[in-house]
Regions:
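Generic recognition of long tandem-repeat/solenoid scaffolds
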Residues: 93-99
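Carbohydrate-binding surfaces of carbohydrate-active enzymes
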Residues: 1-37, 146-156, 161-450
Length: 450
């Protein structure tokens, strides 16, 4: 957890199979610029160092690998009106020598690095050869030992919160344009070059808002570049990861299911997400979402504004949007046959109880969820602090006998609700592509609420 560790195999694999990011360093060429600038002295030739915050600081994660293949993609200068000039050839060693014309200009240094992100020993979700390592180290050993049980005892494989893994661990608000590194690979570079043309390197700085000229032309161009980048990226994720894993499973007589992180808009962002909910899960045999830790609550569409960990809680999305993501993918993708899965009940604490679990089940059933993965049974001694409630808890859960009644009820209702085609009278546009172009785009939960 999260999916992508591949049994630790990436610790010993070639650098080319590991995760990679791109970054930008921007520097205004003001009145004190005299025609030369030492890029090394200004620390513009490497990614800006950041201290871990939030969950990364709490977990005190240490880099699993350190890489020495950092490189510069290109160096450009941007004029406030939108004009860009490639000055890569004007750099002598680490010194820029360029006569600045009149006007306001910003230096942009774009580079790529593998020394970014919290999980540097995980597969690169955009590289098919890297994703194949997950098959070789986890899936194929299962086939080797238990092939006779595939399709019988072993129903399939579950991907749990696979991530692109750039930026900070579980970062919030990481819309396109914010100060973060972005996922990269040779595959993405080739596709982006083909889509944007020979001047693609000069367009890369538009992926970030920092010091972006306040010009309508520039903003339109930036929206185009960001949309193309995310389109290329998420199609690579779909093909390299989701379709490849799902294809292997079906070839071996089992299903492929799971979910990504959907919280706080992550379903259409990088970082802890896969950039696009539908593309990220397109190779699966069921759609999937996760309700955990007080996300869905009775009358919880407005309050509370924070979860149990003190992080922001978007109750409007959890109440109106979460289950609809899974239902939509299950209905519009023939391969899923209407099957929408939800991992449910986990980490609500011991106060959850059967009454709240019944509410959660009903909430999800009427919104199109047909398959459930209850979270979680724990073999650890009671009380295990890891994400309770635990349904048996070695006999310490007094409501466990009634949990069986709830499961029987959910099975009966889900059998009925999944027995025919859903007829939708209203269509809501998935806002992923709109947010890539404009971070102020209305999220889908707003019209769903109305």
């Amino acid at each position: 957890f999260p999916t992508g560790y591949a049994n630790g195999a990436l610790k010993e694999k070639p650098d080319s199979l590991c995760r990679q990011s791109i970054y930008v360093r921007k520097y205004p060429l003001g009145k004190d610029y005299g025609g030369t600038l030492n890029l090394a002295e200004k620390k513009l030739l490497s990614m800006k160092e950041k201290k871990p915050t939030g969950m990364a600081a709490f977990l005190n994660l240490q880099p699993a690998r350190t890489f020495d293949d950092d490189s510069i993609i290109g160096i450009t200068v941007q004029e406030c009106g939108g004009k860009s000039v490639d000055v890569t050839d004007c750099v002598d060693g680490t010194v820029l020598r360029w006569e600045k014309p009149a006007g306001e200009w910003t230096l942009c240094v774009c580079g790529k690095t593998r020394n970014a992100g919290p999980h540097r020993d995980y597969i690169n979700m955009t590289n098919p050869e890297s994703c194949k390592i997950l098959l070789e180290t986890v899936y194929e050993p299962h086939w080797k030992h238990y092939s006779e049980e595939f399709g019988k005892t072993i129903a399939g494989f579950f991907s749990d919160e696979p991530e692109l893994g750039n930026a900070e661990l579980y970062i919030k608000g990481n819309v396109m344009g914010c100060d973060q590194d972005l996922p990269w690979s040779d595959c993405v570079e080739a596709d982006l070059s083909a889509r944007l043309g020979k001047e693609w390197k000069m367009m890369l700085p538009m992926l970030w808002d920092e010091l972006l000229p306040d010009s309508l032309t520039v903003r339109k161009n930036a929206a185009m570049v960001r949309t193309v980048y995310m389109d290329v990226l998420t199609k690579r994720v779909r093909n390299a990861f989701s379709e490849q894993i799902g294809g292997w499973c079906r070839e071996h007589g089992v299903q492929y299911i799971g979910h990504m992180i959907e919280d706080e808009g992550q379903h259409c962002r990088t970082g802890s997400g896969l950039g696009h909910y539908f593309r990220g899960l397109q190779g699966q045999d069921m759609s999937g979402v996760d309700d955990i830790g007080g996300q869905i609550l009775p009358q919880g569409e407005e309050e509370p504004k924070q979860n149990s960990l003190g992080s922001p809680r978007n109750g409007e999305f959890y109440h109106y949007g979460l289950a609809k993501l899974a239902e939509s993918a299950a209905q519009i993708e023939p391969q899923k046959h209407g099957n929408a899965m939800c991992e449910v009940f986990g980490n609500y604490g011991w106060a959850e109880g059967i009454r709240l679990e019944k509410y959660l089940a009903d909430h999800l059933l009427v919104r199109g969820i047909t398959q459930f993965v209850p979270h979680a049974f724990s073999a650890a001694p009671f009380p295990d602090p890891d994400c309770p409630p635990h349904f048996y808890a070695h006999g310490h859960n007094p409501q466990y006998r009634w949990f069986a009644k709830l499961m029987a009820y959910m099975n009966r209702v889900a059998t009925i609700t999944s027995s025919d085609l859903h007829v939708a009278h209203v269509a809501i546009l998935y806002h992923g592509e709109q947010e890539w172009a404009d971070c102020s785009a209305m999220p889908m939960e707003k019209p769903l609420h109305k």
